A protein has these predicted regions:
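Short, contiguous, well-structured surface segments enriched in hydrophobic/aromatic residues
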Residues: 1-29, 33
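Acidic, Ser/Thr/Gly/Pro-rich intrinsically disordered interaction regions
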Residues: 26-189
Length: 189
């Protein structure tokens, strides 16, 4: 349940924030989330599974101990299909699933899309983040404060410190690509 509720809350609040930012941003993000819903069965399954849990039943029907300290939970397809509020598309998705549904692979398939939504929101606020940095720098100058820098250390002795500017332009270019392909798997290194 926590994953379903967190996913739904994240998407809802992201749309609320985009709406506050402006109509174009909200429309872009709404289009993106609609496209993900239309094209990714795992995403729509979890979006509707939250409603199932809140309004109908706990979804797990089988528990298997596979190691002394590890268990696996499975949803039973026939139990899920007893719920009548899945909607036609998600109901068909569930009908195509195995009788015992291990949701872990479904979760893994949803994460790249959630990251895309997050990065799109970051893109909308990137200029604000940069402006905040300038405002902070101006305050530090005004009050004669030492200007902070973000540094990385190569060793524990505080030697070889490296100042790395944040590559905002490259990040913005990458996020811009998400408008056209929200299913890119972006791995952070």
């Amino acid at each position: 349940f926590n994953f379903c509720a967190s996913m739904r809350t994240f998407v809802d609040y992201t749309l609320i924030a985009a709406n506050r930012k402006g109509n174009a941003e909200h429309d872009d993000l709404k289009t993106m989330t609609s496209q993900i819903f239309d094209e990714l069965p795992e995403y729509r399954f979890f979006e509707k599974l939250r409603n199932y849990i809140i309004h109908y039943s706990y979804p797990f029907g089988t528990l298997r101990k596979i190691a002394p300290d590890r268990v696996e939970f499975f949803c039973m397809k026939n139990h899920l299909l007893e719920y009548d509020a899945w909607g036609a598309i998600v109901k068909k998705d569930i009908e195509l699933m195995p009788e015992e549904i291990d949701i872990r692979p479904y979760i893994r398939k949803v994460f790249p899309s959630l990251e895309s939504i997050y990065l799109m929101m970051y893109y909308y606020y990137a200029e604000d983040y940069c402006n905040a940095n300038s405002i902070l720098a101006n305050l530090q100058k005004k009050y004669n404060l030492e200007y902070p820098v973000i540094m990385s250390e190569n060793n524990a002795d505080n030697k070889n410190k490296i100042i790395r500017p944040f590559p905002v332009k490259k990040i913005v270019e990458g996020i811009e690509m998400l408008k056209y392909n929200p299913f890119l798997d972006i791995s952070f290194v």
